[in-house]
Every structure is written in structure tokens, then in C-alpha cells.
Amino acid sequence: MYKEPLGVKVDFESGVIEGAKKLVRRLSDMKGYFLDEETWRELVEREDPVVYEVYAVEQEEKEGDLNFATTVLYPGKVGKEFFFTKGHFHAKRDRAEVYIALKGKGGMLLQTPEGEARWIPMEPGTVVYVPPYWAHRTVNTGDEPFIFLAIYPADAGHDYGTIAEKGFSKIVIEENGEVKVVDNPRWKN
């Protein structure tokens, strides 16, 4: 009749959620995402590092329910570009999401379908509201794992294909020791 409430332990230091489904994304899983393809290939052939891990607690895909997940985004760069998550729109575009930074330093890159972009820096305690219709990607700009918690509608779904095809209109790089958000020369609108 009623769904059972659920309580789980989240380790804020490691990002692990007990009993959660784990997804691991290596650099080899992100072919075509980084601008410097030669450096990407060298890194994949040499070590194929883990870029990020997701620990997800998912419900049935139905309206009114919520999923939550932590992501551990490791430090690193491909060329000048900081490590980032693949990024996505929601399959149901009118669904929002909330991110809460737990550890480390990074930010959220957001964009509309037309490519209008926003950058929101994140550190522990930062809460980011991702409005409906905005694609979003997190970026680790620090030198330790960037860990955050995401809460989103169970029926939101993920559209990774649009970002895989078009990319984001901006990229986040390190230049002269500073974090810079610059135009992506490969952006396809």
C-alpha cells in the first residue's frame, strides 16, 4: 500500500553511499568529450584513469518520487581542461535537480539548449539549483576529489546523447594557474 521510508549512510569523506548502485566512468568512456584528443588518447593508453564514480539510490521511474546519488569526481586534466562529468539534459526536460557540495572544490557548468551558459563555483556547503531545461556538468577544479550529492525526480531520466553530439558551449580550463571558463571551439548549435 505505502512505500517504505528509507535511510542510508552517506560517507561525506569518501562519497560512498552504503548499498548504493555504483557506476565507474574511466577516461576511455569519455571519447570525444575533451578538446585535446591527442592527450586524451595518450592518457587512456598509459593508465586510463577513473574520472568519476557515482553511488546512486534509485526509485521506480514514476512521477513524485526522488532519486539521490553522490559523485566522486577525481582531480585531473586532459591538456588544459579539468576533469568533468559527461553532463546531461534530463530526458524529461521540465525536471529540476539540486546539487550539494560535500568535499573538495569545483563547479557546475550549465547551459540552455541554445547554448547560453552559466558557471557556478562550488565548495563544501554550496547548494546549486538546476532549473528545468538546463543541461549540467560538474567540473573538479581542485587537487582532491570533488564530492557532491544530487537529488532529482525519479522520472527525470538522462539525455547524454545531446551533449555527446554537440558538447557544451563553454569549457573550463586552467590558464596561468587560474580557472577560466572559455568558449568551446567545437560547440555545435
Swiss-Prot record:
GO terms for cellular component: cytoplasm. One of its GO terms (biological process) is glycolytic process. Keywords: Cytoplasm, Gluconeogenesis, Glycolysis, Iron, Isomerase, Metal-binding. It comes from the Archaea. It catalyses: alpha-D-glucose 6-phosphate = beta-D-fructose 6-phosphate. The keyword Transcription regulation does not apply. Pathway: Carbohydrate degradation; glycolysis; D-glyceraldehyde 3-phosphate and glycerone phosphate from D-glucose: step 2/4. Binds 1 Fe cation per subunit. Its main location: cytoplasm. Its EC number is 5.3.1.9. GO terms for molecular function: glucose-6-phosphate isomerase activity; iron ion binding. InterPro entries: G6P_isomerase_archaea/bacteria, G6P_isomerase_prok, GPI/OXD, RmlC-like_jellyroll, RmlC_Cupin_sf. It is found in: Cytoplasm. The keyword Isomerase applies. Its cofactor is Fe cation. Fe cation binds at H88, H90, E97, H136. Belongs to the archaeal-type GPI family. Homodimer. This is Glucose-6-phosphate isomerase. It comes from Pyrococcus horikoshii (strain ATCC 700860 / DSM 12428 / JCM 9974 / NBRC 100139 / OT-3).
